[in-house]
Amino acid sequence: MQTAYWVMVMMMVMWITAPLSEGGKPKLIIRGLVPNDLTPQRILRSLISGRTYGIYDAKPPFSCAGLRGGCVLPPNLRPKFKEGR
C-alpha cells in the first residue's frame, strides 16, 4: 500500500514538473490542473453529500443557499445524534 502511495505521489510530481522543464510558468501549470467550474460551493456540496455525489454532479440532494442561509439537508441525510450527551 505504501509503495502504491509513493508511486502516485511521484507521478503527480512528474506531471507538474514536466511542463516546468519545458518553460511553463508554475501559476499557469497549477491553474491548468484545476477544473474551471470548481467553486467553494461545489467543494462544500461534495464534502457534505459524502461519497454518494461528487463535485461534478449537476443536482446534489440538498440546496445550498450561500453562506448566510447555509445548507439544508433532507431528513435522510441529516446526522443522527444520540441523546443523553
UniProtKB/Swiss-Prot annotation:
<dbReference type="GO" id="GO:0005576">
    <property type="term" value="C:extracellular region"/>
</dbReference>
<keyword id="KW-0872">Ion channel impairing toxin</keyword>
<dbReference type="GO" id="GO:0099106">
    <property type="term" value="F:ion channel regulator activity"/>
</dbReference>
<keyword id="KW-0629">Postsynaptic neurotoxin</keyword>
<keyword id="KW-0027">Amidation</keyword>
<feature type="modified residue" description="4-hydroxyproline">
    <location>
        <position position="79"/>
    </location>
</feature>
<feature type="propeptide">
    <location>
        <begin position="24"/>
        <end position="51"/>
    </location>
</feature>
<dbReference type="GO" id="GO:0090729">
    <property type="term" value="F:toxin activity"/>
</dbReference>
<feature type="modified residue" description="4-hydroxyproline">
    <location>
        <position position="75"/>
    </location>
</feature>
<keyword id="KW-1015">Disulfide bond</keyword>
<comment type="function">
    <text>Alpha-conotoxins act on postsynaptic membranes, they bind to the nicotinic acetylcholine receptors (nAChR) and thus inhibit them. This toxin inhibits both adult and fetal (alpha-1/beta-1/epsilon/delta and alpha-1/beta-1/gamma/delta subunits) mammalian muscle nicotinic acetylcholine receptors (nAChR). In vivo, it causes paralysis and death in mice and fish.</text>
</comment>
<feature type="modified residue" description="Glutamic acid 1-amide">
    <location>
        <position position="83"/>
    </location>
</feature>
<dbReference type="GO" id="GO:0035792">
    <property type="term" value="C:host cell postsynaptic membrane"/>
</dbReference>
<keyword id="KW-0732">Signal</keyword>
<keyword id="KW-0800">Toxin</keyword>
<protein>
    <recommendedName>
        <fullName>Alpha-conotoxin PrXA</fullName>
    </recommendedName>
</protein>
<dbReference type="GO" id="GO:0030550">
    <property type="term" value="F:acetylcholine receptor inhibitor activity"/>
</dbReference>
<keyword id="KW-0964">Secreted</keyword>
<keyword id="KW-0379">Hydroxylation</keyword>
<feature type="disulfide bond">
    <location>
        <begin position="64"/>
        <end position="71"/>
    </location>
</feature>
<feature type="modified residue" description="4-hydroxyproline">
    <location>
        <position position="61"/>
    </location>
</feature>
<keyword id="KW-0528">Neurotoxin</keyword>
<keyword id="KW-0008">Acetylcholine receptor inhibiting toxin</keyword>
<feature type="signal peptide">
    <location>
        <begin position="1"/>
        <end position="23"/>
    </location>
</feature>
